[in-house]
Amino acid sequence: MPFAIGQRWLSESENALGLGVITALDQRTVTIYFPAADETRIYAIAQAPLSRIVFSKGETLSHQAGWQGEILDVQNMNGLLFYLVKNPQDEDVIVQERDISPIISFSQAKDRLFSAQIDRSTHFALRYRTLCHQQAQFKSPLRGLRGTRAGLIPHQLHIAAEVGNRVNPRVLLADEVGLGKTIEAGMILQNQLFAEKVQRVLIIVPETLQHQWLVEMLRRFNLHFALFDEERCNDFDLDAVNPFTTESLIICSLNWLETHPNRVEQALDAQFDCLIVDEAHHLVWSETSPSAAYLFVEQLARIIPSVLLLTATPEQLGQESHFARLRLLDPERFFDYQTFVKEQEHYQPVVNAVESLLANKALSAVEKNHISDLLLEQDVEPLFKAIASNNDEEQQRARQELIQALIDRHGTGRMLFRNTRQGVKGFPHRVYHQITLSEENDKIDWLIDFLKLHRDEKIFVICQTAATAIQLEQILREREAIRAAVFHEKMSIIERDRAAAYFADLENGAQVLLSSSIGSEGRNFQFAANLVLFDLPTNPDLLEQCIGRLDRIGQKRDVQIYMPCAKDSPQSRLARWYNEGLNAFEQTCPMGMALFSQFADELEKVRSNSTALSENEFSGLLKQTKTAREKLKIELEKGRDRLLELNSHGGEQAQALADQIADEDNSPELVNFALKLFDIIGVEQEDLGANSIVISPTGTMLVPDFPGLKEEGVTVTFDRELALAREEMEFLTWDHPMIRQGIDLVASGDIGKAAMALLVNKQLPAGTLLIELIYVVESQSPKGLQLNRFLPPTPIRLLLDNKGNNMGEQVAFETLHSKLKPLGKNIANQMVKMARSNIESLITRGDQLVKSLAEPIIAEAKNQADQQLSAEINRLQALRAVNKNIRQSEIDILEQQRTQSLDELSKANWRLDCLRVIVTNKE
């Protein structure tokens, strides 16, 4: 059928888009706008998966104005249809097809049944189960959290759930080194992408970390990002195309944007939804002279709705630098540094009160006054009385309620997440070994002996410079044939990736990785547990960064730190200062840089000449440092923001979330569904044992391509621990693209839409007709509203006997399906022809019955949406009165969403998705 502008067509692959209208046409493509979903699609005319929608005389037509009427006549004029319709006022009116409502139900299952396109009964069962699983997954609170290839770390899951559920989140992720900020950012992003809150994402990272982010996003989250650099962008300049509009998920380097201002302008014009900046502490800012990098990130942050900044801890940054990050997130709120400092001081009494609540101590009168001042709108006297009561359960409830109220009103608690090792338990120990040598030149011999003694271990070696690392590699290779990889800042990103992969290879890889102290930034090697400091890093932060390559989440063993140096050498004395003064080898030392600056003059003498200080003078320096460290530690502990820590690690709720995902990991439900899906589609399966299988395409599959299935096959596992150990395997969860798109493949395709089966039952007369009808209640609405969380496509099952009685509740689906036998296609077609009028009558009866079942589902969805969105709006409005970090724009968006959501849910409808005709026989 020829295309014409104004015609109405249906997408066969995306029924949920509703009825589309042709808006543009050329020799090769047709453009269709789908008003119900506010989406546009462009199709190749030769292969367009479209169905022309033509209504017949006697059918009911829905007008876009909201009324319905019976079609009296149909006329075709130049390819466009005009319907003569009787409207509700009993008037005959002409309706052009462009005025037909875009929200429309299609009984394609019936059409397939009567046109001899009858599927097997097992295909119908797969379709119904798929619809049920689809509904369950849209409603699941674990959606977007469980699919990450990572361990179930409670604080990471808490942050991902808390931030991921927000509208346009703008937050600072400032966990200590090794606690997984990259994973947190990826989980937040995945959550937002799943909810369709964001679609276009820009990630800006240091040049050395580009490939690592690219690999992490793909390996852990199945997100395919594009890497942008000048060479790639130059290809688009000839066509005058903004390169940033050619991809939705983009990674680029900070240095590249800094040196190419024209690319910043293009990024500003590309309308991204989400900005992620790693190592944001490198953005230098002061009130008088902010850096160029800070300024262009500020420009991007002003126009991109969602912003995630990954940065060092506030203790490491210093207050001014910390303020600069917060200023990027909310310049209206953080407009003046001195005001910010005063506000931070104001929270100290509240922190003290929280300490008392956590320690189950009685609240002092001063603490009660501070709590009352902060919670002005809440009557806290009953809670104070409960805390003073003798009822332990009542006491704990009141303490938790007060703590939660204080967290909600915390100064930066909504914008800042900072977990510390002190707050996150379960890390292995660090064990420091100082190796005293006769001479500095003995280090190479010691290293060779050490490597020979630990042949089966992976060893990470830190050198001061790239030259030292290169020289060491040559010596190890030539003298002992020790396989070593080199890693330093002068290598290209690809060379560093290859070196890291060579070191990570457990079978044929390098035993040792020789890295410059700067070159290792951002790289993680927690599969190794031995660190050799061939040269000592020049400051405490650099030392912590080097140790943090191994000592991080995922490390299973104690980290052994070896420091070989000559007795009384400058390196030896500096190592003693790190160890005895800072205790920086065996514990993290957030005050390290402050002490390094405080004793800079003395340390400079030690580093330049080991005898510049006498032993007594050096011992005095160690004592002074230790005393200053203890004093700073006490001050830090006093200023330790327990409210922020509670908000960041999530406590019992975070653990409960991890436990829920672990329970789902152990459930056989996904495995059973996936294997049945692969089997019916025609995907070949080879069991490898040990919780893994190889799946491969075949020439007899029901579909041309199965999502994510390569021609050579894919090894998959449903086991999280195995997936973490074997990166070459795909980790299948309900969130994996192969499963999600497999569900979409079935739900949006024709598999199982019309089926027929035989029921052997001696109690029923032979030839008794039953019909199973599966309707789907859904809302055809814009994606951004995320109405699937309230009303996902919801299947309603009817089982009608030949008198039109619904037995769906009395006869369970699986019980009935297990008793059915297949029918040959020819016999099935003959039976359908013979029973057509009865089948049509039963379908009409089903259409009448489903209304009473669908309307309560829609009403409940509206009620849920109203309650949930209203509760969040009311909560934010109450908090905004006492916490300036709540943005009015966030409340405005939620109010707009509530109005639009309720309006769209009122338009929700239902359609017949699939049916199964069942004929009985005695045998």
UniProtKB/Swiss-Prot annotation:
A Pfam family the protein falls into: Helicase_C
Record's keyword terms, sorted: Activator, ATP-binding, DNA-binding, Helicase, Hydrolase, Nucleotide-binding, Transcription, Transcription regulation
Gene Ontology molecular function terms on file: ATP binding; DNA binding; helicase activity; hydrolase activity, acting on acid anhydrides
Entry keyword annotation includes Kinase: no
Subunit structure, interactors included: Interacts with the RNAP. Has a higher affinity for the core RNAP than for the holoenzyme. Its ATPase activity is stimulated by binding to RNAP.
UniProt domain Helicase ATP-binding: residue ranges: 162-332
EC number, UniProt record: 3.6.4.-
Gene3D superfamilies in the record: 2.30.30.140, 2.30.30.930, 3.30.360.80, 6.10.140.1500, 6.10.140.2230, P-loop containing nucleotide triphosphate hydrolases, Tandem AAA-ATPase domain
Species this chain originates from: Haemophilus influenzae (strain PittEE)
Top EC category: hydrolase
Name of the protein described by the UniProt record: RNA polymerase-associated protein RapA
Function, in words: Transcription regulator that activates transcription by stimulating RNA polymerase (RNAP) recycling in case of stress conditions such as supercoiled DNA or high salt concentrations. Probably acts by releasing the RNAP, when it is trapped or immobilized on tightly supercoiled DNA. Does not activate transcription on linear DNA. Probably not involved in DNA repair.
Residues annotated for ATP binding in this entry: D175, E176, V177, G178, L179, G180, K181, T182
Sequence motif: DEAH box, positions: 278-281
